[in-house]
């Protein structure tokens, strides 16, 4: 056997080269994708609109629509989101908006939560309080999400009632000096409907 035969035998008997692992693709990991799906499911379960999902969940619109259909059995409703701050300062919704915003501030200051997680937790707290009092809900999840956005952007703020000392949602340009809430000084037509949430829950 000559040198060439020995070399050929060595090459033929050598193990096959191990293929190199492919570098991970840039972008989200599988775990991040699963987390976003869980977040979307949680929000859809609370009644979030498609526009809200698109703002908070980093999944393609097509996937969000498909997920919504799978969970709800229908296509997402169309239409614009609430865009006016006036609704939140009207008499009956104001107590509920104030309750929700109080829960949100608690979650961000003492619950170490922020962003959409703080909104989700505060909305659950709001609904739990309503179950305890038997009061009908005035805020959908989309309304609650919009309220928080208005508050964070400085379009709405909280003012303390001089009588009950509770904090209530007011327009950003409303005077807070000697403010009296709608529960302590209800409008004349207020007696024709059901009473809003107790003042103790609004602060």
UniProtKB/Swiss-Prot annotation:
Zn(2+) binds at residues 161, 164, 181, 184. Transmembrane segments: none annotated. It is found in: Cytoplasm. The keyword Transcription regulation applies. One of its GO terms (biological process) is positive regulation of DNA-templated transcription. Keywords: Activator, Bacterial flagellum biogenesis, Cytoplasm, DNA-binding, Metal-binding, Transcription, Transcription regulation, Zinc. Its cofactor is Zn(2+). One of its GO terms (molecular function) is DNA binding. InterPro entries: FlhC. SUPFAM superfamilies: FlhC-like. Its main location: cytoplasm. The keyword Transcription regulation applies. GO terms for cellular component: cytoplasm. Binds 1 zinc ion per subunit. Heterohexamer composed of two FlhC and four FlhD subunits. Each FlhC binds a FlhD dimer, forming a heterotrimer, and a hexamer assembles by dimerization of two heterotrimers. Functions in complex with FlhD as a master transcriptional regulator that regulates transcription of several flagellar and non-flagellar operons by binding to their promoter region. Activates expression of class 2 flagellar genes, including fliA, which is a flagellum-specific sigma factor that turns on the class 3 genes. Also regulates genes whose products function in a variety of physiological pathways. Belongs to the FlhC family. This is Flagellar transcriptional regulator FlhC. It comes from Cupriavidus necator (strain ATCC 17699 / DSM 428 / KCTC 22496 / NCIMB 10442 / H16 / Stanier 337).
């Amino acid at each position: 056997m000559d040198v060439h035969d020995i070399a050929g035998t060595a090459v033929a008997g050598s193990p096959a080269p191990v293929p190199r692992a492919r570098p991970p693709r840039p972008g989200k990991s599988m775990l991040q994708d699963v987390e976003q799906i869980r977040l979307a499911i949680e929000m859809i379960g609370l009644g979030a609109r498609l526009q809200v999902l698109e703002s908070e969940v980093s999944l393609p619109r097509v996937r969000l629509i498909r997920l919504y259909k799978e969970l709800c059995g229908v296509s997402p409703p169309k239409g614009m989101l609430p865009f006016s701050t006036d609704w939140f300062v009207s008499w009956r919704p104001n107590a509920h908006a104030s309750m929700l915003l109080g829960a949100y501030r608690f979650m961000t200051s003492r619950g170490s939560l922020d962003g959409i997680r703080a909104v989700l937790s505060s909305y659950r707290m709001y609904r739990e309080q309503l179950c305890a009092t038997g009061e009908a809900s005035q805020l959908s999840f989309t309304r609650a999400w919009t309220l928080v956005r208005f508050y964070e952007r400085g379009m709405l703020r909280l003012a303390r009632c001089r009588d009950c000392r509770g904090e209530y949602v007011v327009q950003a340009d409303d005077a807070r000096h000697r403010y009296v809430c709608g529960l302590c000084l209800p409008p004349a037509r207020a007696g024709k409907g059901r009473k809003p949430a107790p003042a103790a829950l609004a602060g």
